[in-house]
Structure formats: structure tokens, C-alpha cells
């Protein structure tokens, strides 16, 4: 009886550990996949789609995944939908699965659930605390057709708050 309990406990630990390992990975799919062993990357082409452990969804035309660093770079008509429902359209996004950061140095358009549109030169999204941040030229067009310009902005998805600096309203 004692050995059965030990075996059951070991199986339980194994299953739990296996599920944790799966949760830490990105789930990536594409119509065309190629492995470049020299560079240590996997290349995805034609409708690349990926979900991270927080269920954030990102898609694009082309992607490269570096397994050792757990970094996915998507290029070409890239779209991000966060688990909270915010969307981002841009030309390139980097998903750092180890740090939990999704970012772009390209011009991007963010849309929140209330219909506000935020145009940024770059952004950084922390999936652990659901906060977007950006510095540079930022234009917010709210649902009431008001236009605001900022030089720095923070968007808290969970609390639905936008905090900006150097406001200019038009």
C-alpha cells in the first residue's frame, strides 16, 4: 500500500511538472516552417500565429523563433490581441517569453475596449501586470473624437486607466 502511494505521488509530481513546462512555452503555428540549425532559429512563413502563456495572441506574415532565448520576432502586418482585449497593429513585434515583455520599435496603433485609438512610435507591453508604456510622439484619439498628444504614456488594461505626460489637447 505504501509503495502505491509513493508511485501515485511521483506520477502526480511528473504530471504537474509537465504542465508547468508546457505553460512556459509559446504555441506557434504557421503554414510553412523551416529550421535553421546553424543560426539556432525556427523560421515561420505564411500566416504565423502564436499564443503565449497568458493567452495573448499575435500574428504576422513572417516569424523567427530563437529557442535558447525564448524570443519570437514577427514581421509584416503584425497584430497583437491581449488577453484583456486590447489590440495593436504594427509592422514588427518582439515577444520575449522569458521576461514577459512584448515590444515594438515601429509605429503602432493601439485600440482599447472603449474605442480609443492610440498612435505611438514604439511600445512596450508587460504581460505580467498588463501595462503598455511608450515614449516619443503619442497621439490619442478618444471615442468622443477629442485628440490629445503626449510624450510619454502608460496604459493599465486591468484598471482601464491611461496616464500621460506633457499633455497637449486639440
Q: Which residues does each predicted region cover?
A:
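Gram-negative bacterial Sec-dependent N-terminal signal peptides
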Residues: 1-23
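N-terminal amphipathic/hydrophobic interface segments
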Residues: 19-170
Amino acid at each position: 500500500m505504501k509503495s502505491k502511494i509513493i508511485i501515485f505521488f511521483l506520477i502526480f509530481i511528473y504530471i504537474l511538472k509537465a504542465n508547468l513546462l508546457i505553460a512556459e512555452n509559446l504555441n506557434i503555428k504557421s503554414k510553412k516552417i523551416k529550421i535553421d540549425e546553424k543560426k539556432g532559429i525556427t523560421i515561420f512563413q505564411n500566416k504565423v500565429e502564436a499564443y503565449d502563456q497568458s493567452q495573448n495572441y499575435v500574428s504576422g506574415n513572417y516569424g523567427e523563433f530563437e529557442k535558447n532565448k525564448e524570443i519570437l520576432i514577427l514581421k509584416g502586418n503584425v497584430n497583437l490581441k491581449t488577453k484583456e482585449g486590447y489590440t495593436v497593429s504594427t509592422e514588427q513585434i518582439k515577444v520575449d517569453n522569458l521576461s514577459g515583455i512584448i515590444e515594438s520599435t515601429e509605429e503602432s496603433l493601439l485600440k482599447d475596449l472603449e474605442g480609443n485609438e492610440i498612435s505611438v512610435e514604439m511600445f512596450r507591453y508587460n504581460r505580467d501586470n498588463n501595462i503598455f508604456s511608450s515614449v516619443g510622439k503619442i497621439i490619442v484619439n478618444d471615442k468622443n473624437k477629442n485628440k490629445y498628444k503626449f510624450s510619454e504614456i502608460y496604459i493599465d488594461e486591468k484598471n482601464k486607466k491611461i496616464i500621460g505626460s506633457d499633455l497637449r489637447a486639440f
